[in-house]
Amino acid sequence: MAIFYKNQGFSLTTTNATTVLSINTSSVAIVKDIAVTNTGSSPATLDMYVYDYSASTTYQFIHASVQGACNGNAAQTVLNLEEGDAILAQTPIVNVIKGVISYALLDRTGENG
């Protein structure tokens, strides 16, 4: 098993829920931090979800108002993502919420069993 430490940036350019991180079906991930910033001058609501691939269900884990011109951590705890899981984000104001997800990717490609 190989462990890769990665960062995944995102910018919300639509009001629809957007996949900001997806885990392939041969890996799992441990999300350490989701840093977000609001580059606008007004507060923006941020909703974040985990899509559980094995249950075909989406769970909301963040509903927050991100103040204008500020930074913050959207992940208040570590998130464990299994094979096929994803993180989605949504905001009603486009082009102001941006972020970086820091995570460890545990790649099981080539494992026996």
Name every feature range the model reports, one short phrase each.
Residues 36-41, 92:
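Short solvent-exposed strand-capping/beta-turn motif centered on an Asx-Ser/Thr pair
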Residues 44, 59-62, 97:
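Short beta-strand segments
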Residues 1-29, 33, 91-113:
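C-terminal interaction-tip segments
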Residues 47-51, 100-102:
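Beta-strand signatures of extracellular beta-sandwich domains
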Residues 51-86, 90-92:
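Intrinsically disordered, low-complexity Pro/Gly/Ser/Thr-rich segments with frequent PxxP/GP/PP motifs
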